[in-house]
UniProtKB/Swiss-Prot annotation:
Protein role: Ribosomally synthesized cyclic peptide phomopsin precursor; part of the gene cluster that mediates the biosynthesis of the epichloecyclins, a group of nonapeptides, with a likely cyclic structure and dimethylation of the conserved lysine. The gigA translated product contains 4 repeated peptide embedding the nonapeptide Ile-Asn-Phe-Lys-Ile-Pro-Tyr-Thr-Gly in repeats 1 and 2, Ile-Gly-Phe-Lys-Leu-Pro-Tyr-Arg-Gly in repeat 3, and Pro-Asn-Phe-Lys-Met-Pro-Tyr-Arg-Gly in repeat 4 that are converted into epichloecyclins B, C and A, respectively.
Protein's organism: Epichloe festucae (strain Fl1)
Residues in the signal sequence: 1-18
Designated gene of the protein: nc25
UniProt name for this protein: Ribosomally synthesized cyclic peptide phomopsin precursor gigA
Pathway info: Mycotoxin biosynthesis
Length: 131
């Protein structure tokens, strides 16, 4: 028992003396020090070897993809007109979700296509703690 305590305290003393009391090293960062930005951080180009027929070498500066567009892959017919690749499509004006709720709103019969008023002052019930 005594040997265990002596060994324990000797180990603590040895590690305590071996550990440096100050941070050792070059350019130690302290709390509150302003850090430099990573200068000229660039993502390496890992794309194709040919751009517009020109051979691309490592380190070449590449142009941005001007007017990059996602190709249209939707239906072939829009409003009865044949849609060709490259045609500019209009936005869906007045797109509305169909009403699929109850048949009665405030005692009135609701028909398909009727415009429904927004629910004023709709509130979620409070389900939190009492205090």
């Amino acid at each position: 028992m005594q040997f265990t305590l002596i060994f324990f305290y000797a180990t603590l003393a040895a590690f305590g003396l071996a550990a440096p009391s100050e941070q050792v090293g070059r350019d130690v960062v302290q709390e509150g020090d302003e850090l430099d930005k990573r200068i000229n951080f660039k993502i390496p180009y890992t794309g194709a070897d040919l751009v517009d027929g020109d051979d691309v070498q490592e380190g070449d500066k590449l142009d941005k993809r001007i007017n990059f567009k996602i190709p249209y892959t939707g239906a072939d017919m829009v409003d009865g007109d044949d849609v060709q690749e490259g045609d500019k499509l209009d936005k869906r004006i007045g797109f509305k979700l169909p009403y699929r709720g109850a048949d009665m709103v405030d005692g009135d019969d609701v028909q398909e296509g009727d415009e429904l008023a927004k629910r004023p002052n709709f509130k979620m019930p409070y389900k939190g703690a009492d205090m």
